[in-house]
């Protein structure tokens, strides 16, 4: 596709964790790329630096807010595709995006803020269950309104989970002992953030992903917790002491711990105890798999990912 034929993409939540990767990939792929930002974001030193980077890619900044219907509608009328990457506190506010898309009438595809695990297959405990339920509610609303969509299921963000194996306070993989959630046997899936962005932007104009759930399941990256630890042990030539956190232990911490830890552990319970990331088949016609659709994309394997930490 030449640039003039590529869809115009609006990213809402573009300065967030996964949003910034999508903005960069969209712009560098030749899509006219727009980012909705609050004017107050410019006053944040870290975010303003990121916004300068966006400008260097040729991104158009549109000032507005997900809670301001007028600014939302104005932004949406300028594009073909809307991608939302808003965080959990704003999942419910995506109703405003749905209403604006409905009113504008010009959107060819909406990608709501998914970018995690398939909430239609997950069996999460609180506080993750409420977050997943909000995503489910948004899905059903999109479908009921007849808005063209793609749901992006990328599973674990590799850069978020693999460097610390779920221990949020660590910056590098362990070299002495490791805590493993559950028995470590259920398979999970890990995808590098840059690859998530590449597959997502590939999908926006692809008729094969229209009204479908796009699952990212790179074959080399479907690994159990035990397999990830073994791979790391091979890299460093050392056997780690393994502490297995039982389901009972996890449930106890989820009850008593601080909220960010509770949410993270509840998601870990869903993935590593229930196996919700990979315990189901991608079912056509509603489900499609990214590495099968885009075999030319060279994804980063978990094995390659760990090389930089050795």
From Swiss-Prot:
The family database entries (InterPro entries) matched by this protein are listed as:
NAD(P)-bd_dom_sf (IPR036291), NmrA-like (IPR008030), NmrA-type/Isoflavone_red_sf (IPR050608), PCBER-like (IPR045312)
Name any GO cellular component annotation: cytoplasm
The induction text for this entry reads: Stimulated by jasmonic acid (MeJa). Induced by wounding.
Kindly identify the residues recorded as the active site: 135 (proton acceptor)
EC number(s) on record? Answer: 1.3.1.-
| Matches recorded under SUPFAM superfamilies | NAD(P)-binding Rossmann-fold domains
Cellular compartment(s): Cytoplasm
Q: What is known about its subunit structure?
A: Monomer.
Family per record:
Belongs to the NmrA-type oxidoreductase family. Isoflavone reductase subfamily.
Its name, as the record gives it, is: Isoflavone reductase homolog A622
Which organism encodes this protein?
Nicotiana glauca (Glaucous tobacco)
